Regions:
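Long, highly charged, low-complexity intrinsically disordered interaction regions
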Residues: 1-67
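Structured, non-catalytic alpha/beta "coupling" segments that mediate domain-domain communication
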Residues: 74, 79-85
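Basic, amphipathic DNA-recognition helix from helix-turn-helix-like DNA-binding domains
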Residues: 84-92
Length: 92
């Protein structure tokens, strides 16, 4: 039987980050949804809008505000994660 988690953080804890989809990892950064939309729903919409994580990487923050359920705090959290990834990629 396939295990279901109520939030991808539980899946990460149990199986490791490698086992999560891009949408699930992004949902962890988004943290919570809004009425009628889970963090995973919002994450999937973000990925559909920008095509991929790479497509998201250089978007102006204002573009993310077009997505219902993304607040300034959530967008800043995503931007910080991308900056950390850039710095790691540069060997920092």
């Amino acid at each position: 039987m396939k295990r279901r988690w109520s939030h991808p953080g539980g899946k990460l804890r149990e199986l490791g980050a490698e086992a999560l989809t891009d949408a699930e990892l992004l949902a962890i950064l988004i943290s919570s949804g809004i009425r009628g939309r889970s963090a995973e729903d919002i994450a999937r919409e973000v990925l559909e809008k920008f095509g991929s994580l790479q497509g998201m990487a250089n978007q102006p923050l204002e573009k993310f505000l077009e997505i219902k359920g993304l607040s300034d705090v959530k967008i800043i959290r995503i931007a910080a994660a991308f900056e950390l990834a850039r710095r790691l990629a540069k060997g920092g």
